Amino acid sequence: MAETSVFSIMMLTVMTAVGRGATDRPGRVSRCGERPSANASVTYNLLSRIVGGTSAVKGESPWMVSLKRDGKHFCGGTIISDKHVLTAAHCVLDKNIEYHVRVSIGDHDFTVYERSEQIFAIKAVFKHPNFNPIRPFNYDLAIVELGESIAFDKDIQPACLPSPDDVFPTGTLCIALGWGRLQENGRLPSSLQQVVLPLIEYRKCLSIMETVDRRLAFETVVCAGFPEGGKDACQGDSGGPFLCQRSQGRWVLVGVTSWGLGCARKWVDNILDPPERRGSPGVFTDIQRLLNWLSANLNQDKPDFPTYEVQCSTNDGIEKGTAGEILLPTDYRKYYSNNEKCIWTIIVPKGKHILLTFNSFNVEWDYSCDLDYLVIYSALGRLIGKFCGDVRPRPLLIADASVTLKFISDFQEYKTGFSLFYQAVEPNTYPDSDCGSVAVIFEEGEIQTMNHPHVYSSHANCQWVVHSPANHIIKITFLVFEVEPSEGCIFDRLVVYHDLQGTMVAGIFCGFSLPDPVLSVSNVMQITFTSDYSVNYLGFQAVISFVLPSSPVKSETQWKGNNQPRKNQDAMQHYEEGCGVSPLPPRFIHHNIIKAEEAMPNSWPWHVSINFGNKHLCNGAILSKTFVVTSANCVADREEFPSVGLIVAGLHDLESSTDAQKRTVEYVIVHPDYNRLSKDYDVALIHVQMPFQYNSHVQPICLPDGHSKLEPSKLCVVSGWDLNVELSTKLQQLEVPVLMDDVCKKYYDGITDRMFCAGVIAEEDNVSCLAQSGAPLVCQSDPGTYVIFGIVSWGVGCNEPPKAGVYSSVPLFIPWIMETILSVAGIANTDTEPHHPLIPPDKLSQEKALLPDSPPSNDSSSSQDIYVTCKDVMSLQSPGEIKLVASAQDGPEGGRCQLIFQAPEDHFILLHFKQLSHEHYSLIIYEGASSNKTFKAQLTEEKIPTIMKSVGPVITIEASSTAQDSALHLWLSYSFHNQN
């Protein structure tokens, strides 16, 4: 009877959790794929552009290796264990390589000594036996065994090898590293370089390579790169790592740099170019395809290591019946093999459910279970649990008649494995949930979302019921918490109840802030987790503990909670003071340039929906409290009936606009040169009747200066509700590379100087459907700050083979945009009528009150227009216009002067720059004056803002030169405005 009681409790004690040991042991001295010395806020810049390479940040690549011959770098490599480095086979063809080559790790800049740098001798080299140096296109991989072991620390760590079931989809942005040449036949850099490249579909790569040489056959390669070139690995990068990031953050060695035709050459339309000018994507040796060879050679020095010729050391496959046992390995005295991949599918009679009970469990531990692990999938392929460590997982009740188990082991560290018993049970024996299992917990331990530490599943509906011993209450303490944020937690949520009926709510949680511990009011607690159909994060991990009611409790508020999204307070102290900064920073899970993903709610706070007839028509971006920019083709036919238009800001879900700001359109201003047929000058401004109220969901986007130009392959972001062919009700985001003009013109007729293309030319989803018109394309300027560079104009239809999107180039329209807004506000020409007859004259006074977002008018009736030379200090206390000139004639050592603009105490200053040209002059702008001034900006001819706003009432422009051939011409207007 006692035995039956114990088994009954075991059946009820069901939870989906990562098994772990009783102590928080590291499992290994190192943690592969992590960067301990890198700043937590710093990551590989996936929105950077590199031609041949740009300097990596020291500490970001602790697995990087330099192979040096006679002290000079010639190839790269990657640390994968304390004694092994991976490189390309073609890098280690020297017969006496052990004598001539040394391995340098912890090095970043070759020109300086770094404390982290260590030099190792080579003990042995193992080239893949199928590598052919005459045709070095396949199996280009070698293991370098070091003479001594590496001592891992914060500066030196191994990269992760891929597991057999790692999948990185086409378009995923990955990183290549090396000290290779910055351009074809160019110079070698002194510091480590990095380049961001998207993965190319395998068959697409093969078709490209046929244009290079039809005789080439590729079996073990992975390709990456941009069709228009501009980014690539280059000479000297050979053997270096090509890494992709798992969803939970670890970096995986997907490839080893092998070869490419030229460096960063374009390969789009290769067949049209002469052979000597053709290019190719970057070609990397595919590590995943060579895992078996790696495992066999990395474990040669382990005498007790079991070797198997088959992929799985036991009999896997289909298990049918009402009960049975699965063992790995089959002999309890042995270990499981490294590099194993075993798959079992359990099928019980139709109408039954499956109970899994673990008898033993000992699998290499890792906090994210990425090394060795057992995963369990439902019949529909939904992940139920992922397990590692030496603690037996609790019994799992699978709400189906079929379940799949997969065991994966990596190339090092092996344990005694596991054994489990499966049994068919009646469906109604225990309550099920859509998680595929139910958790009824009687013991202290951990719970977590399915698939943690990977993203949780869509449509989850999970439930845990916790019972504590008599005279105890339950405490849940959160270790990890990342759940899709939303106001009121309406999308994904974790709810804690004080009762089994679900009537006493202890707390509702979502977002990224770690909730406070939650205490029950009795010895029962119910926890539910639900998710909608999209936007999945890492979920939560929490500790369940039992405490006495007399234990100290902060207050009753500790029992309740509502975990709302974090604000980006550091980036934006006040909503009114900035542009292009999201209080809820954007976040990408997949970093894919082909398939869009749902944006984190309100992370693009300038994006608006333009509605006509109560339906979403197209997109736009907020420029000020009263102006929105969009495409002319969106609104050109609606100029005469603007009042039927509605601008919806702060919107994430088109079907749920409860918290959004809705503004009626006052008038529409289409660029006067807009051509309906050619879509040239495809830009328009929309003025709303009532100003937007800036908050965490509604913010303006920054405008670029008129001289800005995007370089090819620059990665930017386009947002919209329709990026993946079908119209999505929730806002999506997609990273897109900017294409070269000639590539764009090859695919589209009618590309003008006011257009550019961005996106991927591939047989995937089109990014420029009709309903996406007007959507903003934004690029990072400073970290966390975005600038609008493009407005979606047109593209091919959604049902055709896609091409890149065509965008109106915003920098070229800056003069028109600013002139229009200024004329409405009455600044640019206060004594003249507005430039656009659609703007009623009686609206000008209303506009003046809306600054600084719409550039304001002067508060003072007096003004001064001054023409001065650069000498001494000049104080300007009335608004007006000034032209500052200087030349070598001003003095034998050039000129030096200060312009101090002094507004009333409660005002700010608006500078409107009209012209700047200088030779050997330094122009610096400061907030404040004299000893109280602080640096604000440095002006150059290439980087001059159209308008600059001060924070306080005083701003200083300092011009200086010591050169005899110096010259300066600065022309600007300035105005003072009330802070209120």
UniProtKB/Swiss-Prot annotation:
It is found in: Secreted. Differentially expressed in the oviductal pars recta (PR) region. It catalyses: Preferential cleavage at 371-Gly-Ser-Arg-|-Trp-374 of glycoprotein gp43 in Xenopus laevis coelemic egg envelope to yield gp41. Ca(2+) binds at V112, E117. Glycans are attached at N39, N766, N858, N932. This is Ovochymase-2. It is an enzyme of class 3 (hydrolase). It comes from Rhinella arenarum (Argentine common toad). The gene is OVCH2. It holds the Pfam family Trypsin. Disulfide bonds join C75-C91, C174-C244, C205-C223, C234-C263, C312-C342, C369-C388, C435-C462, C489-C510, C618-C634, C716-C779, C744-C757, C769-C798. Mediates gamete interaction by affecting the vitelline coat. Residues 835-863 are annotated as: Disordered. Residues 22-49, 593-980 form a propeptide. GO terms for cellular component: extracellular region. Its EC number is 3.4.21.120. Keywords: Calcium, Disulfide bond, Glycoprotein, Hydrolase, Metal-binding, Protease, Repeat, Secreted, Serine protease, Signal, Zymogen. Residues 1-21 form the signal peptide. PANTHER family: ACROSIN-RELATED (PTHR24252), HYALIN (PTHR24252:SF7). GO terms for biological process: proteolysis. Residues 50-299, 593-822 form the Peptidase S1 domain. Residues 312-425, 435-547 form the CUB domain. The active site is at H90, D140, S238.
